[in-house]
Amino acid sequence: MEEVGIPSIETWTEAQRALLRQLILRGQQTIAELARDQAVSVPFITKALNELIASGWVCEVGRKENYARRAPRLYFLNAKRAYFLGIDMGHLWMSLCICDLCGTIIYAHSRMAFY
């Protein structure tokens, strides 16, 4: 079920998809790092990033450390935006796991299956 006012994944631009892939693969990044790795301008990345922030998929997570000047902001996936459920039904055992968007395990359980 889609939330009101939040675009579905199918309507995302290629830039938004590329940003999410980059954040998944590389972790927390600044706008400058995102722009450099995508080989596009900072304003282009800023626009796509702001759209993802507005829809709740990305959030600011702090500032980069060890900077002589003003430290740039770091962005990462909003872990609470989506959850995944994995179920493994074996012949004798059943296991399930729930994790957030960042891969942190929220719940895991295994037990012997009933016949």
Feature annotation, model-predicted:
Residues G62-A68:
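Short, basic, alpha-helical segments at the C-terminal edge of helix-turn-helix-like DNA-binding modules
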Residues P43:
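Key DNA-contact positions within bacterial/archaeal DNA-binding proteins
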Residues A108-Y115:
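N-terminal phosphate-binding loop and adjacent alpha-helix
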Residues R36, I53-A54:
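Alpha-helical residues within the helix-turn-helix
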Residues A71-Y107:
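Gly/Thr-rich phosphate-binding beta-strand-loop-beta motif of the actin/hexokinase/Hsp70
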Residues M1-D37:
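Extreme N-terminal segment that seeds HTH/winged-HTH DNA-binding domains in transcriptional regulators
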Residues G56-V61:
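A short, conserved structural fragment
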Residues L49-N50:
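Short, hydrophobic-biased segments on the C-terminal half of alpha helices
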